[in-house]
């Protein structure tokens, strides 16, 4: 009984990180950046936002150094990005939840939800 309980506990503990990592919906992401020659943040490389989750969809360059929330995931590493509240405004939620488009998750770093603003 103790062996089976220990085995079950170990299995559950080992499966938790995999289950958490399998779905990024609701996570906060920020574009990957580096410090430029003038000391300001710059994108590591151009980040494109697409109208649909495929590489042939119309695209535009991301220009905002801002955090986003992942609304949905699609095959190929695409995530749908939505805006987060802007606490510099009188009504922070007025700009939250607007769909930006689809982007590659590999172009973003995860950020703690408490810092997602």
Residue ranges and their predicted role:
Residues 16-21:
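Sec/Tat signal peptide C-region and signal peptidase I cleavage site
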Residues 34-56:
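Extracytoplasmic/periplasm-facing segments of secreted or lipoprotein envelope proteins
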Residues 51-64, 70:
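SH3/SH3-like (including bacterial SH3b) beta-barrel domains
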């Amino acid at each position: 009984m103790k062996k089976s309980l220990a085995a079950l506990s170990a299995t559950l503990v080992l499966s938790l990180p995999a289950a958490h990592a399998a779905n990024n919906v609701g996570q906060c992401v920020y574009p990957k950046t580096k410090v430029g020659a003038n000391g300001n943040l710059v994108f590591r490389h151009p980040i494109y936002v697409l109208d649909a989750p495929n590489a042939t969809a119309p695209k535009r360059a991301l220009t905002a150094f801002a955090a986003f929330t992942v609304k949905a995931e699609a095959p190929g590493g695409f995530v749908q990005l939505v805006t987060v509240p802007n606490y510099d405004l009188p009504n922070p939620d007025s700009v939250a939840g607007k769909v930006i488009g689809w982007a590659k998750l590999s172009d973003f770093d995860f950020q703690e939800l408490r810092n997602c603003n």
